[in-house]
Structure formats: C-alpha cells, structure tokens
Amino acid sequence: MRKKQKLPFDKLAIALMSTSILLNAQSDIKANTVTEDTPATEQAVETPQPTAVSEEAPSSKETKTPQTPDDAEETVADKANDLAPQAPAKTTDTPATSKATIRDLNDPSQVKTLQEKAGKGAGTVVAVIDAGFDKNHEAWRLTDKTKARYQSKEDLEKAKKEHGITYGEWVNDKIAYYHDYSKDGKTAVDQEHGTHVSGILSGNAPSETKEPYRLEGAMPEAQLLLMRVEIVNGLADYARNYAQAIRDAVNLGAKVINMSFGNAALAYANLPDETKKAFDYAKSKGVSIVTSAGNDSSFGGKTRLPLADHPDYGVVGTPAAADSTLTVASYSPDKQLTETATVKTADQQDKEMPVLSTNRFEPNKAYDYAYANRGMKEDDFKDVKGKIALIERGDIDFKDKIANAKKAGAVGVLIYDNQDKGFPIELPNVDQMPAAFISRKDGLLLKENPQKTITFNATPKVLPTASGTKLSRFSSWGLTADGNIKPDIAAPGQDILSSVANNKYAKLSGTSMSAPLVAGIMGLLQKQYETQYPDMTPSERLDLAKKVLMSSATALYDEDEKAYFSPRQQGAGAVDAKKASAATMYVTDKDNTSSKVHLNNVSDTFEVTVTVHNKSDKPQELYYQATVQTDKVDGKHFALAPKALYETSWQKITIPANSSKQVTVPIDASRFSKDLLAQMKNGYFLEGFVRFKQDLTKEELMSIPYIGFRGDFGNLSALEKPIYDSKDGSSYYHEANSDAKDQLDGDGLQFYALKNNFTALTTESNPWMIIKAVKEGVENIEDIESSEITETIFAGTFAKQDDDSHYYIHRHANGKPYAAISPNGDGNRDYVQFQGTFLRNAKNLVAEVLDKEGNVVWTSEVTEQVVKNYNNDLASTLGSTRFEKTRWDGKDKDGKVVANGTYTYRVRYTPISSGAKEQHTDFDVIVDNTTPEVATSATFSTEDRRLTLASKPKTSQPVYRERIAYTYMDEDLPTTEYISPNEDGTFTLPEEAETMEGGTVPLKMSDFTYVVEDMAGNITYTPVTKLLEGHSNKPEQDGSDQVPDKKPETKPEQDGSGQAPDKKPETKPEQDGSGQAPDKKPEAKPEQDGSGQTPDKKPETKPEKDSSGQTPGKTPQKGQPSRTLEKRSSKRALATKASARDQLPTTNDKDTNRLHLLKLVMTTFFFGLVAHIFKTKRQKETKK
C-alpha cells in the first residue's frame, strides 16, 4: 500500500500570507528594501500614480501609489537621512537662515541665479496635485509672510467665493489651501510622495533643522496649494478629479501646477473631454502644467529590452502626453550630495568614497573589514567576525548576503557593485544590521588596500558619482502612444533629498523628483518675465518661457556611446535655469509651434528646418550644425542607447535684431540604410539635435531636437503574431519549453496574468463530472461539489490522456492549430475568446466570424481603447490582455448555433497613430456538435479485472480521450480519477481507491463510467454497468453490486477539452476519420476536420505526435489509474473560477483591471493551491 502524506499546511499558510501582502499593496514611497541581487535589463514599471522609483526588485507595495520600479538595479531612497519626529516649525516671519542649503553645495541646474531675479517665488502661488501630503512638516515655512499672495484665511475664502469653490481648507501661511479631490473620505495612506515633491518645489526648512544642510526648494517663498487626488473609482473618474484640481488651482492664482504621476502608455486622445479642457484652460490663463515622464523605461519593463523589429517602444503616458504640459525626464548629474567613508590608501592618502547606507554605521569610528567574496559560502566569512564583511554583488540576494555575514559574526556589510558606472542601490534592512553599497571602483580599491580599515563620516559631502552624467535608466521613453514627441526636457531625478512624512527627510529617485524642479524653474522664469515683458499676456509669457527653457537646455552626451542621448529619452536636454534666465534667443520649428521638430516619416534624405528668434536689440551671429543618429541594436533587441551616424559641418548665420530667421539643414543618411534596415527591418528613427554656438570654441548656446522615422510609423504592426505561428514556440513574453515547443499550459492554478502572455484564442475545458452534473439538471454550478476544476485553456491545445497537467498544440497537416469547439452548452470547448499581446496602442477592436463564403455571421461589440502590453512584471501591467467582448459561443447574429464546419475568426483593430490603416489577424475555428457514438456492450474478467468494449467509438472529429472514470468520496469531497486504456484497448479496473490520508475506499462497478471525448469537446459517457448489461452473456458478478437491467442510452451528450485521439498501435485495424472501423463500409465519405483532410489517420500509419515527441493520448503506464485529481477542492473554488470569466481585464479601464487581478489572484490562489497539492501528491504516488 502506498503511504500518502498529509497536506503541508505550513506552506499553505505562507502562501496565504503572501497573497494577503499582495492585496494590501499600498506603496509608501519611502525606500523599498531591495531583496534581489540578480542583474536585470534596465527598465521599469509604471503604476497609475506618482512617479517615484523602486529601483531593484519590484516590491509588493507598488500596486497602488507613487513609486514605480526602476531597472531592478537602483536605489529608491536613503533612509539614513530620516529624522525623529519634531514639532512643525512656525510658518510666520522668521529671521533669514544662515545654515547652508543643499543647493549651496550642489546646483547642477543652476537655479540660484534665477531665484535671485525672481525673489525665490515670493508673492506667488504654486500647486501640487499628488496622492497625499504631510501638512505638518517643518519645511512648510515662509521667511516673510508680508510678501505672500494670501495674507490670511480670509483672503483665501474671498478668492474661493469669487470662483464658486465651496471646499478646501487653509492650513497655515505656507499651505494656503488643501483639499482631497478623491472623495473617498479616507486619510491619505501615502503622505510621503506628495510631501517629497512639494519640498523640491517649494520647501523651506528652518535653520534649526537637525539635518546638516537645509532643504530649500526651487521656489521656497511661494505659497502652496496641495491637492490630493488618488484613484478610487477608475481612471476616467481619476482624470476628472485632477481636471477639477487643475481648474481650481488656476482660479486660485497658481503660477505653475506640478503633476508627478502618470498612467504609462495611455494616449492623450483617450482622456475625458473635461480633462482636455482643463489643460486648455490652464494654458489660456498662462499657468504652466509640469508632468513627470514616468519610470517605465520602455516596452518590456525592467526585465526585457524592446525588439528591434518593433520600434514603437515608447511608454510615456497621460497626463504627460498632453502637448500643453512640460514633460520631464530624469537624469543623474556627475556630482551628488552623499554619505561618505574614508580609507587610508597604500600611500597613506585619505580616500573619500560615496556610500549609500541602510542602518548607518557609527560615525567617525574606524572599522576593520575583511573580504568575503560574494558572500555565498561559509568559507567566505572565515575572517569577518567582529569586522565589516566586504562582499561583491552577484549570484544571490542582498538579503542573503547580509544574513550570512551576520550569522558569521560580522558587525556590518559593505557590498560593492559588479558593474562599472552603475547607479547606487539601497540594501535591505536585515535585523538592523548596518549595511552600505559602494561602487565597483571603490570596492576593488578596498579589496586590494593593505590597510583594512574604514571610517564613516558624519557629514554628507558632494562627490562625483560612479555613473557620471547619465539619463536615468528608469526614465520613460517616447514617443507617446499618439506618436508625439515626449519628454520635453530633463532634470536631476536620481537620489534627490527632500522632505517626507513625519518631519523627516529622505532620498527618492524618479521622474517625480525631476518634475517639481522644472516646475519651480518655470514659475521663477514666468515671474521674471512679468517684469521683463510686461506687455505680454500670461499665455504669451507661458509660451515664451517654455520655448526658452527647452532651447537653452543642454543636450546630454553619452560618453560610452560617443553620441547624444536620444531626444525620445531626454527631450531637449538638461534644464539650465541660468542660461534660460539670461537668454535673448531661442529656437523653434519652422511654424513657431514648439521647440522640437517632428518630421514624421522620412526617406534616406530629408531636411530639418528651424526658426531662430532674436529678442535682443542687436543682430546675433551664430554657428550651427546637426547631429544625425539612430538606435543602437544588440542582437534582436534595441540596446536603449544611441548610435551616432554623422554630424553636418558648421555653418554661419546672422539673425537681425528683434527678428527671426529660418535655417534649413540637409540630411543624407542613405549610406547607412542597408545596414540599418538589416538590423531594424520595420524601420528606424533618424534623429538628433540642431545645435547653435556664438563661438566655435565655446559651449553650446542653444539647441533643438528633431525626430524622423525612416519607414511607415503609423502602420507598424499593432499586434504580436499568434503563438501558433511561432517557429520556436516562444513569444516576446513567453519562453518556449525547450523539450516541447508547442506546450501551452492552461491557466490552471496560476492566474494567467503571471504566465501565459502571448496572442492566442482561449476556450474552456470542463471536466466530465461537472458536465455530468449539469446534464443531470444542476442549474447552478456553485452547488456542484467536485475535486475537478473548470479551466481556461488555449484553443487548439490538448493534454495527454494520462496527464492533464500539460497542454500541447495539436496541428492540422498544414501546420495550423486544431482549434475546434462544440457550442452545446456543456461548458466544454463551447467558445473561443481572443487574447492578445499588443505592441502598440490601438482603437476600435472588434471580432467577427466569417463562413467559408466570406459572409460575416457574427460580430462582437467594439472595444474602443487598447493599450500596448508594455510590461508583464506586475499584475497591474500585463503582458497580454483578454477581451471579454470578443467571446464567440458558436452562434450567429440571430443567436442560433451555426452549422458544423470551418469558420474564420477575425480580429480587427487600428493603431491610433496618425495615418494608420486598419489591421486584422485571422484564426481558423472548427465548429462541430456531433456526439461520439460509443459501444453499447462490454465484457469484464474478474480474473484480471479487465474491461473489454465491444467496439471502438465513432466520432466526427478525432478522438481526444477515451477513459474510464471512477468517483468516490474522499472524506466529504467527491473525487474523480481516470483509467487510461491498455495498449490492447482494454481497461484494468481497480478494486479500491486510496484517500489522501492513506486509507482505502472499496469501489463498486457502479462507480465506473466509460467516457469518450473528441477534439471539439463533444463528450459521451455510459455507466460500465450498462455496458455489461448490454452484453448477451451477462458477466460474472464482482461481488460488489448487481448489474442493472436498464439498457444503456444510445446517444449520450457530449463535451471536450482537447488532444490527439487515443490510438493503439498494436491493435489493427482501428477506426478511420469517420469513427468507423476500416473493415466496415462507411455509409458516406469520412467527415473532414476543416482543413480539407480526414481528421483521423488509420492506426497502421505512424501516429501524429506533438512537439513533446509523444503521441497525444498514448498511455505510458498500461491500464493504471491516471490520478488526475484536478485543480478544484471545493464548490466555492469552482464558483470562483466560473465567475472569473467575467472579471478578466480588458484595456477599457486599467485600474479596474488591477482590482480584478488582485481579487482573482487571492481567491483562485488559495483554493487552487489546496487542490494543486492534492494533485501533485497523487501524481507522485502514481509514478512510484
């Protein structure tokens, strides 16, 4: 007797805890603890909320709020800067402070000069729309409230009344207005992101701060309007809420509005009309809206580079995609304020190095350290007791490295990078163990240094960064989904120190941190222009400020690639407030629309025409040239790096005073086209900058980015090809099984969003026991108690007869999948539904079914909005989407089941890019409702317990599975298991069944049922007792029960789930495609499978095999029970799975999709895990 094991409930509890964590995901924007140390590709995931970054592994706290993971290798924040809670500082008049500000030490954007010209924003109001704020932080302070726009609460109330605003509160002199527009009545869970953003824009910490340096925002003397907006009732409602906040900010006198949040890859065209009107309203009133570009890098997320065949890999979404906004990318400057440590080098020189700490080391104390390799083995730590362990990054998680060091007696850990020029990474907190991350260069210095001591300094300093000046790898690329140029400009967004909740300070990274700096600069520049250009209207000053700011930005250069970073990544370049403030010239496109040039489709040769504007009273002599570049390709993927092609020669031009003049630069890239098309067959970008200097020996004065596409950008394919067409069985998000390339397992216990990401048709496999219950009149499947599960599978896939844990594509002779359905209402292969991996945003998706004459017999409802599947790292960003409206149940437009035959299932959609034409993808689908005919009699031998049927089944479609099912009670759960046929076609019936607790249950003959299923999902089943009764010589009784005298039903009903027919090579001859034996004359020609060929080949020919190399339905263990205790453990689980069909996400409402996904993960995971453990145990025991 095989001994069975009890369920591992300890593991089940852990799994449930994990599920609970996932569902309670509320990102808190502070530094996410890094838990992984495995290198990953340099991308990120955007959530529809504020854009701070979690820069190593995605945290379970990222589903809802601000942070968005960076490229799995970088740091989010520096908790070492946290302060203990303090009483908020007074917001009234305070003497000028003498403590140095962070900007005094490091000002890469050169803001101080502009601050002086514009009085640091005194007398102005700025608005921040975000997820939450700490209204009591010490940084909310005015130096002189007599210069404030709103002198009192009464002044605010008067302004509110003038504009019909009946809500919002006065907080203090600094925070003139606060209101929660989310209308959810809850206190904001996340207060940190908005607090951090507001500090960058307008923080003004007092000199009494415990920080070594004082926080001062770009506009420290401006008053704040804090407006909380969070997703509560869907994205559309969310957009309407922040639209109302925009209108109120404008009416309350805001000079600039910062919006550091976004919905990746969403198109501006899909925003509600009231949101678009709010943007237009702000523009008309001269109010600048500054948005963050997002932290999603590009199509593919943090683990995958975009394919070189699909150049539309930009993911900048809304609201950043709006033309009227100023959209900001993130870059890391060459110097950074950082914690430091000092070592004595071999020549006795002090060497300072930047460190990023988690749980700080004691300052000014000399620590001994010892090298511990990669911190994996016990031997690595033989010398670390009482010392700091110096460990190289790689191989295992940071958490494990730190835990191993602690176990070995180390007093702390230093982990150094395994990559040159990498960004710093915050390490996880492991039992409060002091730990710090350092660069590879410094780590190697420590390793080789003979003096193994290090001292951590108390005061942070400005030191060069290991990465140098570089675009942040998480920063989202353009173009937008609409095909427009974004981002507009770049600003520092890497490890930015600012205010966070509870009167603390921390470093965060993300485009959320870049945007408020630019917002502050825009506010200061507009205030300067009020004096400089008093005759201009506010909207004219806004337009000029945006163009000047972009023109005066410095195009960032990639020293590694010897080329400028792409305009699709950096926009016009790094913001430079000093240059903007002093600028008397700027450059725009030829129509003076904006300071960027979008050429759309171009050929090998084209021209770039720009307009140079001179607002000074003197003529200006300039030199200009253009850089020409494209994308670098690495194998089959874009490297997300620039590739320089050439530069034009410098030319000279003179611009008259107070005038403008056009400049045209001819570009000829024809000599590169052959090689570039070989790497990027569907086209490539030709882009760069037109740069201007006043003197060839001096720095760039101004520049303008241009972008063209060599090809037809609008008509690039929107949908990835179906998985059925893949030569190696893989897709962008799906790795093929190396042993069986056509293996496509169904959803099973693992929710599909976590694995099956490709383009295909789905259907549903309903187990025999459920079908039987339905046929016997059970109307509500929730009332069915069964060990089996209704499972979503892929049309054209079938399981092995003895193992339904894996599904494989079964193909016609022409290579197309055998996608067949039987729409008879039994829930087994009754429908097909479209699932797609979209490479681009599309609109007006509709499915239709055509008969063989090309007539449309059915059309689905329209899905108006389709968002590209840009990432599959989290449940909130899927690698594919299932479209519920495309579900076809085999009926025509009048609701009648169509005739048996082959139909074309067509999915039509149109990319949203300008000039795009409609595209479509076709699938062949067989409809067949013909019920299998089975034997009406059988014999049973009590000697060897073999059941022999009188004849083989006759089917219209090939036989998928021929089995004996038996059902018994395992405790209180009805349990079904199956017996596959022996090689001679007989079945060996067991005398007893084993329970999960190791006991046995005796089986009666009435427990057995003969079940036949064809590849369209038609099922016939007959009790074995009826088969025995049908035999002329009644069989010997088995002692368990009497054979009933009722005759078997002639034509039982059907079902299906999918696989090649059960063929027995040694039994000659077997049935042909008609389901009849070859020696019997068929009444008509064999029915065909829709491909024009007879479905079933004769058994004497070699059986078809799937990609696993096995014949579908072949039974390795002769006549043994196939213990397929399927995946359902209770009626509740079955009901959950059934209802899940109507909850699968579509692209209509992404935040709703997220809620659906989270709920489904929890509900299906628990019940599925229980049943999965049952099934796994049984299958292992069967194989023993």
Swiss-Prot record:
PANTHER family: CEREVISIN-RELATED, PEPTIDASE S8. The active site is at D130, H193, S512. It comes from Streptococcus pyogenes serotype M6 (strain ATCC BAA-946 / MGAS10394). The modification Pentaglycyl murein peptidoglycan amidated threonine is found at T1147. Gene3D superfamilies: 2.60.40.4070, 3.50.30.30, Immunoglobulins (2.60.40.10), Peptidase S8/S53 domain (3.40.50.200), Subtilisin-like superfamily (2.60.40.1710). Keywords: Cell wall, Hydrolase, Peptidoglycan-anchor, Protease, Repeat, Secreted, Serine protease, Signal, Virulence. It comes from the Bacteria. Belongs to the peptidase S8 family. The lineage of its organism: Bacteria, Bacillati, Bacillota, Bacilli, Lactobacillales. Its EC number is 3.4.21.110. This is C5a peptidase. This virulence factor of S.pyogenes specifically cleaves the human serum chemotaxin C5a at '68-Lys-|-Asp-69' bond near its C-terminus, destroying its ability to serve as a chemoattractant. Residues 33-52, 89-100, 1109-1123 have a biased composition (Polar residues). Residues 1-31 form the signal peptide. Residues 1029-1054, 1061-1071, 1078-1088, 1095-1107 have a biased composition (Basic and acidic residues).
